[in-house]
Amino acid sequence: MVNAEDLFINLAKSLLGDDVIDVLRVLLEKGTEMTDEEIANQLNIKVNDVRKKLNLLEEQGFVSYRKTRDKDSGWFIYYWKPNIDQINEILLNRKRLILDKLKSRLEYEKNNTFFICPQDNSRYSFEEAFENEFKCLKCGSQLTYYDTEKIKSFLEQKIRQIEEEIDKETKLWGK
């Protein structure tokens, strides 16, 4: 069985790539708040690179920070920590984002008419087909009407499925 930290790291990797994982691992291993400078020293990389990675992680909800002002210099000091307890919320937000994209795509499919090249399967909106006299830009073949009912049906099914998952998880986790 996969432990929570591995799941957390794998989720971050799938959303943000390998670049940020070193910073996330250091925070998870430390188990307490760390400054960007402490992380940079431990990884032996530039503080600016650490800050970029932390900001990417923060945008997706993987880490959070608190800031205090240094009494001597007046500069802000940021203390970072992993939000491993927020993994369900991160997944839920990701599903909501996917749901929005699927709904947008469904609207696009419903509001447009499409044509397809029988040779290379290039798909064109009515406007594109009209501008090109209903000929394929790649091979010059005559375009034919493309029925999008299967695509719309598939999108509607996926939208219902994700909405049900979000509803179930929202009730389960109270988010």
UniProtKB/Swiss-Prot annotation:
PROSITE patterns: HTH_TFE_IIE. The winged helix domain is involved in binding to DNA in the preinitiation complex. Transcription factor that plays a role in the activation of archaeal genes transcribed by RNA polymerase. Facilitates transcription initiation by enhancing TATA-box recognition by TATA-box-binding protein (Tbp), and transcription factor B (Tfb) and RNA polymerase recruitment. Not absolutely required for transcription in vitro, but particularly important in cases where Tbp or Tfb function is not optimal. It dynamically alters the nucleic acid-binding properties of RNA polymerases by stabilizing the initiation complex and destabilizing elongation complexes. Residues 4-88 form the HTH TFE/IIEalpha-type domain. InterPro entries: TF_E_archaea, TFE, TFIIE/TFIIEa_HTH, TFIIE_asu, TFIIEa/SarR/Rpc3_HTH_dom, WH-like_DNA-bd_sf, WH_DNA-bd_sf. Monomer. Interaction with RNA polymerase subunits RpoF and RpoE is necessary for Tfe stimulatory transcription activity. Able to interact with Tbp and RNA polymerase in the absence of DNA promoter. Interacts both with the preinitiation and elongation complexes. GO terms for biological process: regulation of DNA-templated transcription; transcription initiation at RNA polymerase II promoter. Belongs to the TFE family. It comes from Saccharolobus islandicus (strain Y.N.15.51 / Yellowstone #2). It comes from the Archaea. Keywords: DNA-binding, Transcription, Transcription regulation. PANTHER family: GENERAL TRANSCRIPTION FACTOR IIE SUBUNIT 1, TRANSCRIPTION INITIATION FACTOR IIE, ALPHA SUBUNIT. This is Transcription factor E. GO terms for molecular function: DNA binding.
